[in-house]
C-alpha cells in the first residue's frame, strides 16, 4: 500500500453462532487496493446472556472453545505500570471513551470493580514491545482473557519463536497479573 492508493473497505458480520454463555459473532474487515487484499481483521464478540432466535443451544463440539492449558508465567521481559488515567488518556486519542475505561462509577455499572484498560491499548503496547524486529509487514494475533484493572501492573514476556514454516522468525507475547498469575492477553507477531 502506498499513499494515494484507492482503498476498498469491506466490513461484515459473519458466523453468528450459539455459545455456552450467549451468542458469538465474527466482525470481519477487509481492505483491498488494486484488487489485492492487503488487510484482513477478524474480531470475535460474545453477547452474554443472549440466545439465537431459533433457540439453538450449542453442542459441546459447536462451542469453538479450545480448552486452555494451565498458564505458567514465563520470565518477564517488561513490566508496565498503568496509572488510573490510562483509560482516559487512550480514550482521548482513540475516540473510545467507553465508561468502563474512563469512570469508576461507569465501570462498576458494568460489573467491574474499577476502570479497565482498553484491550487495544494493551495489544498495541505488546506489539510495540516486539519492536522493529517485527518488520514492516507482519501478521498479528491477540487473544484477550482477563481485563487489566486500573491502576495496575502487567508483567510481559516477549519470546522469539523457533524458525520454522509456521512461524518464520516470529514472536509470541503474553501479559499477566504478577500477583494473581492470571493472563490478560497473549498473541503472536509473524513477519511476512
Please place each PLM-identified region on the residue numbering.
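Active-site-proximal helix/loop capping residues that flank conserved catalytic or ligand/cofactor
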Residues: 41, 88-89, 124
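Catalytic-pocket segment enriched in acidic/His residues
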Residues: 100-101, 105-162, 169, 175-176, ...
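Catalytic strand-loop segment that frames the active site of acyl-thioester-processing enzymes
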Residues: 45-117, 131
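HotDog/MaoC-like acyl-thioester-processing domains
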Residues: 1-79, 148-150, 157-192
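A short linear-motif detector with a strong N-terminal bias
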Residues: 6-10, 22-24, 58-61, 94-95, ...
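Residue-level signal for the start and early helices of compact helical domains
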Residues: 22, 34-37, 71-73, 81-84, ...
Amino acid at each position: 500500500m502506498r499513499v494515494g492508493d484507492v482503498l476498498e473497505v469491506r466490513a461484515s458480520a459473519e458466523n453468528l453462532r450459539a455459545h455456552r454463555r450467549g451468542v458469538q459473532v465474527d466482525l470481519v474487515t477487509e481492505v483491498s487496493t488494486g484488487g489485492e487484499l492487503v488487510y484482513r481483521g477478524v474480531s470475535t464478540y460474545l453477547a452474554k446472556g443472549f440466545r439465537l432466535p431459533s433457540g439453538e443451544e450449542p453442542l459441546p463440539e459447536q462451542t469453538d472453545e479450545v480448552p486452555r492449558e494451565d498458564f505458567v508465567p514465563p520470565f518477564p521481559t517488561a513490566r508496565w505500570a498503568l496509572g488510573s488515567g490510562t483509560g482516559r488518556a487512550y480514550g482521548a486519542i482513540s475516540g473510545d471513551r467507553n465508561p468502563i475505561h474512563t469512570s469508576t462509577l461507569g465501570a462498576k455499572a458494568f460489573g467491574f470493580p474499577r476502570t479497565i484498560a482498553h484491550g487495544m491499548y494493551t495489544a498495541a503496547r505488546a506489539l510495540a514491545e516486539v519492536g522493529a524486529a517485527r518488520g514492516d509487514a507482519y501478521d498479528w494475533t491477540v487473544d484477550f482473557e482477563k481485563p487489566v484493572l486500573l491502576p495496575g501492573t502487567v508483567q510481559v514476556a516477549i519470546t522469539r519463536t523457533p524458525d520454522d514454516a509456521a512461524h518464520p522468525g516470529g514472536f509470541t507475547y503474553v501479559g499477566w497479573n504478577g500477583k494473581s498469575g492470571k493472563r490478560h492477553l497473549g498473541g503472536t507477531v509473524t513477519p511476512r
